[in-house]
Amino acid sequence: MSKTTITYKDVAPEAADDASVSANGASSFSDITRLPGGGSEIAAISGELNYWALDGKHVAVDDNDIAFWSTELSGADGVFVNKPVITITFTQQHSSMGVSFRFDTATGGHVNSLNIKWYQGTTLKANKDFTPNNAVYFCEHTVTSYDKLVITLNGTNLPYRYAKISQIIFGLYRSFGMTAIRSASVVNEMDGSALSVPVSTLRWTLEIRDNVEYMFQLKQPVEVRNDNKLIGVYYIDGYSRTAESVYNLDCYDAFGVLDESNFPGGVYTNRSAKSLLDEIVGGHFTVTSEVADTNLTGAILPCTRREAAQQVLFAWGVCASTDGRDGIRVFSPGSTPSAIGTGRTYSGASVEVASIVTAVKVTAHAYTQDANGSVDIGGTRYKDTTTVYTVTNPDVTATDKPNVVEVTGATLVSAAIGQSTAQRVYDYYQRRSTNRAKIVWDGEMLGDSVTVPNAWGGTTTGNVQKMEIKLSNTVAANCEVLGV
């Protein structure tokens, strides 16, 4: 039987990206900058007492990204003479329920005594000793509004061992199965035309079964999985408490996060689409292999970062989604269909056919500096010269109602790509059939090309545009598949 889990990362939001790490007593091959994000978790070759078994499972340190090894071995009593100290500073203040450590998880070795001091500026907010008893250990102590941690490692659980830390987490991860989840639903959505960038959502109700405090914070990440398949990563947008142990939580995806910060805009000439998207979203995206970079000329007016990303994606001619990964996936929709058979399809499939599009008009823009211009970007005024590119449907009959799609606000569409962009939008709107079918989800992702049964014994082939997922141990998804 499959298993569905929701992992709530009860961590200080954005603290890992905000952290700067320094250390006394770290080995020369340690890359302490990896501590907030995590380094390699390996059984390494070393000269430690009774550590390196000749079983072929230990590997060389040089071939891996080690976050932290101490320079010094602990003594016969497991205590360090010169105690390693790790200092982590932040540019912003953060709050968390404590600090988690991943020590030598490959062998079970761990630091067995440490001290953490939390600071706000020069003020010591908390000072606490901990005695870890596992290679993964949570040092529980709630502290709010701190901007520095000083961690002192006192000793190891076995004598003559290095202190090894693969990751420091500013909080802890809590996983819940369906016994603790009263209800949960996911809506994952994309726009194959890139004329919009929808926000995908997770709404769930959690019933706490243990006497544990929670510190739900905006933008804390939540992962949803069915077995080993990642459905999506979402971020807390708000919550309500309806009983002592019952919480209703609303979450959105990375595009929802981008919608809450502004982009100042700019004017660009032959700017790499990939580098411009990186400037907007901060590198939290991947581009699939079939997508080639392109150069864009035009402007982005001041707007939210989600709106700015949409401008780039549309002019680039690609799609984006957040399902099935941590971050944004930039891709071209699949063209080789995989079949979703009747064994995974519930009864009640339907097909809706949209009205014929009689023409598409796309407005291209050219921006030149002009003191009397109508566009203001960063305090500089620009004149916007526009050109309209049209593609007309040659198969329109006398009985067809006029239905013209007009795209006027795509400010990164220049004259060089105006006609090809109009053709691309026209081609998209020739796909008029939307098949709605409820399926047993098996890892399908937005943009996948699939063939699904319809209500009259045939099939419809197209790309997945939307999935409304009701979470249980068997995951059912109401899919919308757009085809010809």
Q: Locations of the language-model features?
A:
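Short beta-strand-centered interaction patches in the first periplasmic/extracellular domains
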Residues: 1-13, 123, 142-150, 156-172, ...
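Short capping motifs at secondary-structure boundaries
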Residues: 281-286, 316-318
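Surface-exposed, non-catalytic interaction/assembly patches
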Residues: 1-37, 131, 171-195, 259-269, ...
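An acidic/polar, Gly/Ser/Thr-rich interaction patch typically located in mid-to-C-terminal regions
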Residues: 79-83, 92-95, 102-118, 188-217, ...
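Polar, enzyme-active/binding microenvironments
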Residues: 37-173
